[in-house]
Amino acid sequence: MANHSFNLVTEPWIPVLADGKHESHSLETLFDQPTSIRQLDIADPLERVSIMRLLLAIMYAARQEGYSSPAGAKRIMEAGRDQEIIDYLHAWAHRFDLMSETEPFLQVAGMMPQGKPKDYGFTRLHPAMQRPLWQTHDPYKPVTPAEAARMLLVCNMYDVAGVHTGMAGDRKPREANVPHRGWRRPEDSLLPSSTETTCGRP
């Protein structure tokens, strides 16, 4: 079987406006050459905010102690790159592979739904696509790995509400939807945190 891979650290998947041109950058390029990038070139506001949240999460993870001083942050900003973020991406590149067989990005390898699997098609990848009237993507056109990565981010950050199909072997979807009610409002918050008994009652 072919060993498919699409690593978000090295593969271009983020649309940007750089030096007056429409381009696609990888995470590594985005952080390595930030001064040439004017802005994210994404029309969909959900995708744009989702990518911004990912970029912030990477920055905070790479610099858990923050910057030594405002002057230090200014020097890095003027230099146009932050080596600590680049090093972080290289160290954790294996966790950014969209198609990894063991640790796919923002997914669980081998996870299957309860019951018989269903093919929901393209629309489930993006909350805005739930109503075909408003979708801007041809549902019969294959989705590129870059598009799938952006839609996966949106789906993880802005998933639609409602009851979702549970994972095979997980009892929670069947048993966790019943709220515990107490005699008083504070007990409503306390009861779900208890193990067996609270206030002498099961």
Tell what function each PLM region has.
Residues 1-202:
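Conserved small-residue
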